[in-house]
Regions:
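RNA pseudouridine synthases
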Residues: 1-124, 131-137, 142, 182, ...
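Pseudouridine synthase
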Residues: 18, 28-32, 137-190, 209-210
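A generic beta-sheet turn/junction motif
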Residues: 51, 159-161, 194
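Beta-strand secondary-structure signal
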Residues: 83, 98, 126, 142-144, ...
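Short acidic, Gly/Pro-enriched loop/turn segments at secondary-structure junctions
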Residues: 135-136, 194-196
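A late-sequence structural motif
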Residues: 150, 196-199, 204
Length: 217
């Protein structure tokens, strides 16, 4: 890797910047172990990002920290914020998306459904349009998304359901082929697994299409 994937490391946990295209089960732990000069089996995954999605993640380094961070995930004390670039301009420019999602395990895809049944779970997020642009002749929006639930492909499905698939996400209807799925984990907030001090970590997306078409502070 040209730059460090480690953003912060302590005895009980580490925070990394997951590269786009790296899967969480085997490839990312190997990268982290190589950089940390530790064994792969000393790293504990407490949440995941899809292969096509990059950004901030936290990994536990002890069983006790893994249990504590997993508890925070389950109790929604671990807060996740994403940047996304979607086709079209969502209206209103600030709002909430609430859906019932069904995960099709065969197709490895989520679908919004009208009524609850076995396997259906509620999905909730807040979004805010930050900027708009014309990308390859079509309108697109840079959106900040705060997750309140962590459903399978939640952001991808909820935006696509409203006619705004994420750029590069062919699985959910995007026709843009010049990029991978435009979704980035930009901010992670949680409590230190030992001291319980609140922590926040952030990372900007790479300066490649479509992220490089927007102004960043």
């Amino acid at each position: 890797m040209d730059e460090s994937v480690i953003l912060h490391a302590e005895r009980s946990f580490l925070v990394c910047r997951k590269p786009v295209g790296v899967e969480c089960e085997h490839e990312l732990p190997a990268l982290l172990a190589e950089e940390m000069k530790c064994k792969v089996d000393s790293l504990y995954c407490v949440h995941r990002l899809d292969r096509a999605v990059g950004g901030v993640m936290v990994w536990a380094r002890t069983p006790k920290a893994a249990a504590e961070l997993s508890r925070q995930v389950q109790e929604k004390a671990l807060k996740k914020v994403y940047f996304a670039v979607c086709s079209g301009i969502p209206t209103p420019d600030t709002g909430e998306m609430r859906d019932l999602l069904f995960k099709d395990s065969v197709k490895q895809k989520s679908f919004a459904v009208k009524s609850s049944r076995r396997g259906v779970k509620e999905a909730l997020l807040d979004y805010r349009v930050l900027q708009t642009a014309a990308l390859n002749g079509s309108p697109a929006a840079l959106v900040r998304v705060a997750l309140h639930t962590g459903r399978f492909h939640q952001i991808r499905c909820q935006f696509a359901t409203r006619g705004h698939p994420l750029l590069g996400d062919g699985k959910y209807g995007s026709r843009e082929r010049g990029c991978t799925t435009a979704l980035w984990s930009c901010r992670l907030a949680f409590f230190h697994p030992e001291t319980h001090v609140p922590l926040v970590f952030e990372a900007a997306p790479p300066r490649v299409f479509p992220w490089d078409r927007f102004a960043w502070n």
